């Protein structure tokens, strides 16, 4: 099993980051691999049990899709997810956590665990996930960049300057 952890400090409130993270129609605007997100089941009022299909780019113009089950949702603080594989044993899991730092700053923590069991994918697990990890980190940076380029987006969630 492999694990990837990434943390970054971002110049936005946790609430504003959360709002954009929950705005699935916009994921393709900042996440380089994401083409679309389809919400298949909205889950409960907090978002627990949300089931989403993430459609993403693959090399050579191909497309892939991942089913993600979202749990342990705490609004503006984080959630856990499980990527449900077609084959038993290939599920992946991860979490996103937002740590408010005050002054319109938040530390975003991202982690993901994966273990490919099927040939030929398991032979290429290292290179595959190095690529995916770089794309995930880029998505987190571009999430912040997108908010910086769109100051009008949920401006009500920006802390007033003191």
Model-derived features: positions:
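Generic structural detector for well-ordered beta-strands
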Residues: 7-9, 38, 55, 69, ...
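Hydrophobic-ligand binding "helix-grip"
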Residues: 28-29, 57-107, 113-115, 145-149, ...
